[in-house]
C-alpha cells in the first residue's frame, strides 16, 4: 500500500497510525482530524480534568507516530470508495490504498447548546474548560440532563463543588445501563446522600433560553427547573454522514466484521466509537462501544489487520472495559451491561460498598461489575464466554475488607434492567 489515510484525529486514529508505523508500514500516512489539536485523551475530561488533577499536558497522548501528514482542523465529508478517495470539507481529494475509519462520535445534543451561554456538552478540551470555568465563578444552579456515566460524573463533581445540582434522566434508575441495577442502586443512594436532586422517569422538553443564555430546563410534564448551568449528557451519535452513499453499511455506526474490516471492502477498517462489531456474547449483535480501552484495542487490531489482509486477519476478542469513580465509589465493568436484564451478586455486599456482580441477558452472562473489588474481578472475567449462565458463575473465597459485613456468596437472579 503506497498511502493509508486515517480519518479521525483522536485516540483511535492516533493509535492506528502508531501501530501502522510500529508494524513496519513505510508508505505515506495521512491523518485527518476535525480538531486543531494533536490527538489527546478525552477520558479524563469529565473526571480528573474537571478537578484540575490533570492539566492539558496530562491529556497529551505519548509515543506519537513518526512521519505522518497531519491534516488537522479539516473534516472528511464524503468517501468515494470506487475511486478510493476521501473528500475533505475544502473539496480536497486524498487518494488511498488503505483507509482507517476512526471518525468517532459526537454528543447527541451538540446543536441544541451551540451559541447558548451556560449550556454545555462534554466532548472536547474546550467543552471541559468552559464548563469548569462556569462552576468556578460562583455558586450555580446546575442541571445535568442524562444519567449515564458522564452525567453521573458531572453531577457528582458539581454537587461536591457546592452547587445546587439536579440530574434528569428518563429511566427509573440512572447508570443502570452502564453498570447494572445493583451497583446503580448503590450509586443512586450516594447521589442522594451527597445532595444531588434526582428527577428519574423524566425527560427534558427544551432549554429555556433568554437573551442568549440558558435560564432553565422545561420538562416533559410542563414543569421548569431554573438553571444557570446545563450539561447535556444524553449520549452520542456516530460520525458517519461522510460515509453515506459510499456503499458501506453505516446505519447507526460503521458495520464491521469481527476482524474490523468494513462490510463491503477489504481496503477499509474501522476503530473506536464509530464502529459496530458482532459480539459472540450477544448472539452476534453489533453494538457500538464507547470506552477508552476498547478504542485502543480496536486501533491496534484494525491497523494490524489492514496490513495483514482479510486472509490473515485476526478477530476481535477484547471485551469492553471501563472504570469510573463516583462519590468515591470505585466501579469497573467488563462486557455489555447495557444488554442485561438479570443480575446476581456473586461476592460481597453492594450495600456495604464492596461487591462483585454478574449480569445476564436471559441465561447468558454478558458482563461482570466490580464495586471496590477490582483485584478480584479477573476471576469473573475469565468466565465471560458464550454459554455461561448466572448459575455457572463462581465468586471468590477472599474475605471482605476488615470491618465489612461477611460475604454474601450469592443472591437470586433479579429480573429487570
Q: Language-model segments: which ranges?
A:
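FAD-site-proximal beta/loop scaffold in flavoenzymes
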Residues: 117-139, 213-218, 223-301
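Glycine-rich Rossmann-fold phosphate-binding loop(s) that bind the pyrophosphate
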Residues: 8-11, 123, 145-148
Amino acid at each position: 500500500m503506497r498511502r493509508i489515510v486515517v480519518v479521525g484525529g483522536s485516540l483511535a486514529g492516533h493509535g492506528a497510525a502508531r501501530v501502522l508505523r510500529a508494524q513496519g508500514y513505510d508508505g505515506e500516512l495521512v491523518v485527518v482530524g476535525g480538531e486543531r489539536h494533536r490527538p489527546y485523551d478525552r477520558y479524563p475530561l469529565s473526571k480528573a480534568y474537571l478537578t484540575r488533577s490533570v492539566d492539558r499536558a496530562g491529556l497529551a497522548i505519548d509515543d506519537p507516530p513518526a512521519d505522518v501528514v497531519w491534516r488537522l482542523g479539516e473534516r472528511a465529508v464524503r468517501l468515494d470508495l470506487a475511486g478510493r478517495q476521501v473528500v475533505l470539507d475544502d473539496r480536497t481529494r486524498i487518494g488511498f490504498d488503505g483507509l482507517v475509519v476512526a471518525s468517532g462520535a459526537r454528543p447527541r445534543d451538540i446543536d441544541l447548546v451551540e451559541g447558548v451561554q451556560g449550556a454545555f456538552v462534554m466532548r472536547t478540551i474546550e467543552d471541559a474548560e468552559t464548563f469548569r470555568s462556569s462552576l468556578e465563578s460562583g455558586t450555580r444552579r446546575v442541571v445535568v440532563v442524562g444519567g449515564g456515566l458522564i452525567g453521573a460524573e458531572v453531577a457528582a463533581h458539581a454537587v461536591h463543588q457546592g452547587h445546587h445540582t439536579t440530574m434528569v434522566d428518563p429511566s427509573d434508575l440512572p447508570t443502570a445501563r452502564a453498570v447494572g441495577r445493583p451497583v446503580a442502586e448503590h450509586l443512586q443512594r450516594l447521589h442522594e446522600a451527597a445532595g444531588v436532586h434526582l428527577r428519574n422517569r423524566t425527560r427534558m422538553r427544551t432549554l429555556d433560553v433568554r437573551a442568549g443564555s440558558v435560564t432553565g430546563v422545561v420538562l416533559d410534564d410542563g414543569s421548569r427547573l431554573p438553571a444557570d448551568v446545563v450539561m447535556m449528557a444524553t449520549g452520542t451519535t456516530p460520525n458517519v454522514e461522510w460515509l453515506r452513499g459510499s456503499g458501506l453499511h453505516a446505519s447507526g455506526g460503521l458495520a464491521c466484521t469481527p476482524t474490523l474490516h468494513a462490510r463491503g471492502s477489504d481496503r477499509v477498517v474501522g476503530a473506536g466509537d464509530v464502529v459496530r462489531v458482532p459480539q459472540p456474547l450477544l448472539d452476534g449483535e453489533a453494538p457500538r462501544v464507547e470506552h477508552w480501552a476498547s478504542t485502543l484495542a480496536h486501533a491496534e487490531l484494525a491497523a494490524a489487520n489492514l496490513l495483514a489482509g482479510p486472509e490473515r486477519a485476526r478477530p476481535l476478542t477484547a471485551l469492553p472495559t471501563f472504570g469510573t469513580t463516583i462519590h468515591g465509589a470505585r466501579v469497573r465493568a467488563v462486557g455489555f451491561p447495557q444488554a442485561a436484564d438479570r443480575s446476581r451478586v456473586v461476592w460481597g455486599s453492594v450495600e456495604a460498598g464492596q461487591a462483585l456482580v454478574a449480569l445476564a441477558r436471559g441465561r447468558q452472562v454478558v458482563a461482570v461489575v466490580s464495586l471496590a473489588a477490582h483485584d478480584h474481578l479477573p476471576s469473573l472475567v475469565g468466565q465471560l464466554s458464550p454459554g455461561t449462565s448466572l448459575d455457572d458463575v463462581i465468586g471468590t473465597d477472599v474475605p471482605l475488607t476488615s470491618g465489612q459485613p461477611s460475604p454474601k456468596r450469592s443472591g437470586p437472579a433479579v429480573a429487570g434492567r
